[in-house]
């Protein structure tokens, strides 16, 4: 099947299918506590599941496989469940074949990690590959984010908040996992995600560089929307956390990486913030205005913005609401950021809400119920976890 037609077909179905199945009754899941391997351990800190791993890709993959993925078999079935939820489970074989083709462009370290996860968890490589490429091959992530720079923050430090909006199916939020990676010869970083996810949808590193991905559906006619010969976007953004300390460094690295699809990346360091508007062929920086930058699910830059953009799950309205926090001569509190993220929540599909404080390396995370923006928020001190 032609990849462009396949992507258009699946996107149309997943955004507007009338075959959406009822959500499961919410459940409570907890990872086995205080378990460890030679290169990893899992524990709960302030009611947040934290997996710490270190070493080579194979060693980290072994720890992830044994401690997290093996302990959460239902989470490994999520890609199949989400297709079933939308009534398109028959497309699994297409996603599996497309994902397998994309593995040729995985960074070798990430492929080694994935293979080790499969070996030590018992989850098939096919399921892990689909779980790590489905984001690029379809578009159903609809997120909202905002960064408040130190000049506008009551904390006098950067605040970056985001809602991760993705079908929870009544259970996936319960599998939220903060994985603290301490790879050899790279920066330590925390990825807020799920077991078996190699890349980073949301994260912060030891230097306080933090980021959050927001998918974009459409692009100006004539521009390329998908690149089969690219690195899945979540893996690109993990590379940024492993190698970069500032927004400027991240911009330069991202321009060099082969990119698969269209995304907005909300990014901040301790001094400034921006949104990178990303396509397979371009990376454009949208700078903050008056100390604030907002990010949703559409492009704003004239070079790539469609003439008639799709208003994905009220992306325009969510954007406008968050823009209200750009208040000259006023300081914005963390409580206000959380309040506005709650205002733009997408109900049961808002499965993680978080605020990063780069200056203090703190993460404030809510995930226990949906919409997660309602709280409660628990705080995780990342600085001691980053120590090697």
Predicted regions, residues:
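Charged, often glycine-rich, active-site loop that binds/positions anionic groups
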Residues: 136-148
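Surface-exposed patches in mature extracellular/periplasmic domains of secreted proteins
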Residues: 102, 125-133, 265
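Acidic helix-start/capping segments at beta-turn-to-alpha-helix junctions
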Residues: 91, 131-136
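Bacterial N-terminal signal peptides
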Residues: 7-14
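Bacterial N-terminal signal peptides that target proteins for export
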Residues: 1-6
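C-terminal, well-structured catalytic/ligand-binding subdomain of enzymes
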Residues: 21-120, 150-388
């Amino acid at each position: 099947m032609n990849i462009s037609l396949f992507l258009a077909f699946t996107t149309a179905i997943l955004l507007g299918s009338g075959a959406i199945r009822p959500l499961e009754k919410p459940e409570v899941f907890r990872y086995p506590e205080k378990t460890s391997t030679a290169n990893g351990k899992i524990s709960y800190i302030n009611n947040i599941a934290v997996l710490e791993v270190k070493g080579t890709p194979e060693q980290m993959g072994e720890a992830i496989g044994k401690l997290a993925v093996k302990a959460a078999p239902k989470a490994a079935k999520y890609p199949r469940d989400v297709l079933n939820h939308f009534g398109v489970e028959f497309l699994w074989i297409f996603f599996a074949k497309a994902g397998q083709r994309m593995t040729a462009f995985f960074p070798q370290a990430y492929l080694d990690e994935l293979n080790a996860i499969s070996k030590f968890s018992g989850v098939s490589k096919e399921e892990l590959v689909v779980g790590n490429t489905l984001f690029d091959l379809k578009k159903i992530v609809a997120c909202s984010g905002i960064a408040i720079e130190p000049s506008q923050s009551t904390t006098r430090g950067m605040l970056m908040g985001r809602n991760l909006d993705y079908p929870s199916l009544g259970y996936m939020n319960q599998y939220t996992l903060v994985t603290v990676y301490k790879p050899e010869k790279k920066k330590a970083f925390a990825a807020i995600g799920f077991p078996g996810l190699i890349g980073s949808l949301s994260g912060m590193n030891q230097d306080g560089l933090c980021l959050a991905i927001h998918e974009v559906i459409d692009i100006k006619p004539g521009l390329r929307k998908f690149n089969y010969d690219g690195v899945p976007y979540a893996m690109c953004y993990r590379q940024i956390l492993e190698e970069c300390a500032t927004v400027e460094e991240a911009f330069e690295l991202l321009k060099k990486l082969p990119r698969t699809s269209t995304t907005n990346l909300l990014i901040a360091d301790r001094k400034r913030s921006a949104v990178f508007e990303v396509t397979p062929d371009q990376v454009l920086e949208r700078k903050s205005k008056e100390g604030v930058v907002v990010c949703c699910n559409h492009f704003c830059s004239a070079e790539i913005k469609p003439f008639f953009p799709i208003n994905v799950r009220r992306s325009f309205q969510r954007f406008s609401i968050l823009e209200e926090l750009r208040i000259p001569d006023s300081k914005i509190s963390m409580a206000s950021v959380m309040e506005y993220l709650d205002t733009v929540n997408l109900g049961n599909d808002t499965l993680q809400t978080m605020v990063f404080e780069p200056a203090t390396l703190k993460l404030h995370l809510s995930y226990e119920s949906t919409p997660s923006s309602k709280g409660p928020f628990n705080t995780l001190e990342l600085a001691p976890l980053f120590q090697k």
